[in-house]
C-alpha cells in the first residue's frame, strides 16, 4: 500500500513537471513575440517643434505632386536605399527648416532587411510636409504678398498643412516598412537623421504579414500589396 501511494505521488509530481515545462515553453514563445526593446537611441532633437493646430487656429492646406522617382518600382527603390527596415512608429512631430515643413518620425526598428541598423535601434526619419506656422513659411520664402488677404493677427494664428498628393497620414504605433537614405551633410536636417527615398518607399501594414504601397498617378491613387517574404527577397 505504501509503495502504491509513493508511485501515485511520483506520477503526480511528474505531471506537474511536464505541465510546468509546457507553461515555461509557452511563456518563452510569448516573450519572443513581445514588443522589441530599445537597444540604441539614435534619434535626433528638434530646434522647433510644432503641435497640431487647435480648433482656434486657421489651417490652409497645400498639396504637392508626388515624387515620381522610381515610384512604381519597389525593387529599384530598395536597391538605391541605404537601409530598408520594418518599424513601429513611436512619435510623430512637426518642424521646419528654412521655411520648409517637415515631419519627423521617431521609429523603433523591429526588423532589418538591408543596411547596418539593428533591431532595437530608435532613429529619426524625416518626410517633407506637415504643419508649419504661416509666419515661419513667410519668413523662409519672403512671400507675404501671397497672403495679403490675411491680417497680421490672422497670420500669427494660421498654419499651413503641406501634404503629398495621395499620401496617408502616419500615426503613432503604425507598423511600416521604410526605404531610407542617410541625410547628406549639406542638408539642413540634423546630423544622424534619415530620409525616405520616396514617399512610395513607405509601406503600410495591412494584416496577414502584408504591406501596401500607395502610388499616385495623375489624379488617381492605386495600391500594390506585397507579402513580407516577397519584400525580403527583393533585398537579397
Outline where the language-model segments fall.
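Short coil-to-beta-strand transition motifs
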Residues: 76-86
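Short aromatic-glycine-enriched beta-strand elements
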Residues: 95-108
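Netrin-like (NTR/C345C) domain of secreted extracellular proteins
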Residues: 20-57, 138-236
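Sec-dependent N-terminal signal peptides of Gram-positive bacterial secreted proteins and lipoproteins
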Residues: 1-27
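Short glycine/threonine/proline-enriched tight-turn/helix- or strand-capping micro-motif at secondary-structure
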Residues: 59-76
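Conserved positions in beta-strands of structured domains
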Residues: 88-93, 110
